[in-house]
Amino acid sequence: MGLLTSVSRKGAKALRFFSKRISSFAPLRLGGIFLTFVFLLTFPVHAQDTPAENWAQFRGNHQLTGVSLSNVPATLKPLWTYQADDAIESSAAIVGSTVFVGTAKGELVALNLDNGSVYWKYDAGNPIGESSPAYSDGAVFIGDLGGMLHAVNARDGKRFWSVKLGSEIKSSPVVYGDRILIGSYDEHLYCVSTRNGSVIWKFKTNGPVHSTPGIASGLAFIAGCDEVFRAIRISDGKEVFNVSSGAYTGASPALRAGMAYYGTFDNEVLGVSLEKKEVAWRYEHPQRKFPFYSSAAVTASRVVLGGRDKLVHGLSLNGKAAWTFATRARVESSPAIAGGRVYVGSNDGRFYVLSLTNGAKLWEFNAGAPLSASPAIANGKIVIGSQDGRLYCFG
């Protein structure tokens, strides 16, 4: 069955791009006007959990909350696997009935969410590491370890454009209107046009930009390898404020209700007040002193992330420990949350389902190889890749 005819009714609306802009790529035309937002002193950040039918970028949404509204079955079973030719560290994107994922072989692959059949493969020319695809208006964007940012036709896998951005890219693209925000190891955060890849502006930091930017109120937020958390205005690339994290950060910030949450390599999780522009609290496990590489998932009651201490940590929004769950190896996968359950991979080769309330294990699946990629959730299904090149779908 072809890509057009396999789209579910639920995903048809989200995928109406497949019947438009095939011959002329012009994402999100705004009549030449780029809408900017006023930075309010009260700084409201209204979390918008990911719609049930889509997981269109890393962490699901602009705020990087890692939370889906999808109704996932209480009892999971493996539905299909796809064998890539190399490791999968990239986290998948799901739009309607289509899955997009990058591989270390340098391929961006589009698959059928229902059965895992391949629609197309795009050759990036360089390995794809942790950069995860982002979909917008008929195009899929992804970075590679050669420093290239690619725009690919979501229907047929043909290249719209590609552009070199200084150095290797492990950050994931985030599409905001007709602009793409993405970090590079050349120490810059880039703002690039979706139409042709031209650089609109770039912001210089003092270290590699590994973090994927979170977006709220017209600002891009990055937690940096230079130990600084920054708010950058998307309209012109100017820094609005910064906060010292006190340590190197490899994780991306999750934004919710005026706060940003992320872990550091100084073994801490930080809660940063965006209104006060200061660290509101710091969490550190009392015994196990290991870095946090996993990006947090955030709900109205919990901050959940993995640690290199082999634990999944569940915190209250005030930074107090609510629970921990022990795995057998580092947890570098970033958790996803749906329906009161936490979904996360571990380098012990297992995919875990935990209670959001108390961290109790509800289910596990042994993949037999490290799972450092993060789950994507949409249409009642969960997709995650492994270090041995297998892409799993559960439902």
Question: Whereabouts are the PLM-identified features?
Answer:
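Blade/loop signatures of beta-propeller domains
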Residues: 49-79
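Residues marking helix boundaries in flexible regions
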Residues: 23, 34, 216, 233-235
